[in-house]
Structure formats: C-alpha cells, structure tokens
Amino acid sequence: MGKITVITGGTSGIGRGIAEKILAESAKTDRIFVTYGHDEKKALSFQESLPEEKRSQVTLIKADMSYYEEMMVFVEELKKQTDHIDWLVSNAGISTYAKYEDYSFEEWTRIVNTNLSVPVFMVKELRSMMVEGGSVLFTGSYAGQQAYSSSLVYGVTKA
C-alpha cells in the first residue's frame, strides 16, 4: 500500500512545487491526487510536464474549492479511488486586490470560502481517511502576518 497525498490547488505556484517535490521522492506505489479549479489547460500542462514514468501516479480532479458542494463531490470521488490519506495539503487559494471599501459581499464570501471555510470542512470530511501519524498542511501567507490594504480579505484568511 503506497502513500497517498492530496493537494488542492496543486497545478501551479506553491501547490505545484509541493506536488513535484513529493512526486520526485515517491515510490512507484505512491499516488497524488491534485485538484484544479477552472483552468483545465493549465492542469493538463502540469501533468504533461511531469516525468513520463511518474505521470500515472498523479490523478487530476476538477473541484472549485469556493463551493462546499464541489468539495463534497471531490471528497466522494476521492473515497472511490483510495481508502486512506497520508498527507493532505490544503493549498487552493484566491485573492482579489482591492481596497476594503470596494469589496462586495459576494467577493468577500468567495475568498473566505476558498481560503478558509471549505478547506476546514474538507478536513472534517476526510478525517476518517487520515492514517495515524498522517499530516494536514494549510498553506498560509506572509499577508496573514503583515496587513496590506489591497488584499485585506486574503490576509484575514491566510493568517
């Protein structure tokens, strides 16, 4: 039984770097499940960039983490494909650069859902699949420690 890693938002940026590092050090029996939100072209480009002998270890799953319902569809799909998780990396995140007074309630809610609420409930849903000694990682940001007026809501969710 190989190690199972789940990475949300794993086709670009920090998530992609984590996926590539884990894959580089993985055994042939290990698997990585990577979510992507909207950009299927970028997701396929990520998969094609992987070493050919490792590509079959990576499963891409479309899931917009700003919606609880899509996260639940992802969780159900994951449960069909594996019986355990060793590492869960909650990396999906979004931001809008705007002044506080320019945020709409809908935009604020979308960012909070993507960066905080949905990931917390995803961990709750996947908790029973986590192996003893497994790890959950939430990626944060320096913006969570140092306030920026242009990305207030992002900073709040990444503290």
Feature locations, PLM:
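Conserved NAD(P)H cofactor-binding loop of Rossmann-fold oxidoreductase domains
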Residues: 91-96
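The beta1-alpha1 cofactor-binding region of Rossmann-like NAD(H)/NADP(H)-dependent oxidoreductases
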Residues: 40, 62-73, 105
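Active-site helix of classical SDR
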Residues: 123, 157
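Conserved glycine-rich cofactor-binding loop
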Residues: 11-12
